[in-house]
Amino acid sequence: GMNPNTNEAKVEYSNDPSNPTTGVPSVPDVVDVHTFDFTVNKYFMADQQKSPLSGVGFRLYTDKDCMNEVKVVQESAGDGQNAAVYRKAKAEESGVEAITPAFGKIQFKGLDAGTYYLKETTTPDGYNKLTGPIKIEITPTYEKEKLTKYEVKYTYNDKVVVVSSDKKDQSPTIEVENKSGTELPNTGGIGAVIFTIAGVAILAVVMICSMRSKKRKHS
């Protein structure tokens, strides 16, 4: 949701030039500096229904190559109704891998607006691992210097989804499906080229064998 961190600034001023040490505090300027969050719902399909998947690990980064990690620490374990919460770590804290619980939902909170990359780092046996990171863009909207909502746009395998929040306790949810086996690269990538070349090679072998078989029959 939209989480304000309130900063106050006070200035003391003196009306007595002969006694500059005595100050009168001004009315504090209050500024809300917002941080943002999003929730990951990790699931697999069973009988055409979404079923939560536990034991999936994620790490968050600020770059596409996943070198600059945004370290997080677990704030709460959650329950069936509320996601397990991982907040942005403080400078003195060591980060951890965010792991989906039995109900499959984890929330990343305390984030600045901007672009992030969510990488699946641990996958349970029997399920696929995502072939690349999910790109996540957090964009706030302000009206008269007041935050009214923010959008979370996430992109994976050329599929783009936008979810938004305009309430303090509303966390935009990123839906991430796991399938059994290994996920193929998206169509149009190098994976598709490799499979196309392999298909052409197999077809050529079949045609050569067929031609040789016909020649033997004629001879």
Label for each model-derived stretch:
Residues 1-219:
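Solvent-exposed loop/turn and edge beta-strand elements of beta-rich ligand-binding domains
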